[in-house]
Amino acid sequence: MEFSITYDVLVRGGVDVTSVYVPGADEPLSPADGLVVASRGVKLGVDTTLEALTKSGHAGDYDAYIIPGGAGGANTLSKNPTVLHILRDSHANGKIVGMICAGSLAALEARVGLGGPITSHPSVKDKLASCTYAHGLDGSSNLLL
């Protein structure tokens, strides 16, 4: 839901969106049939893979990076060193970095925006106990919460 609704709203708003497949620890570098199965069985197509994006040298070319929630996906993204590197670089370069729901775990792991307000799904709130818990846009750090 966090991915599909965000993707849909951005596309409807005229934003050029690229979805990226990020494999979990024991998953192939790209989905066999080009589809990712979300936690509730919804099949989603992806535009590229993290491996292809990094090899292209264009991983830092985007205006914004959005980390969707969902426990499984948020866990995968927050443990991927390449994703964390992209988040740190993007935030340092003043790009928008957004985390949705449990996606805030990626902010914690990347050490991005922890000096400002942060929000999350209640299931991961305790992991973010050292942060100021809030909702909204923190204009000083380009973090969308």
Residue ranges of model-derived segments:
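Active-site-adjacent pocket-lining segments in enzyme domains
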Residues: 1-26, 30-33, 40-42, 46-145
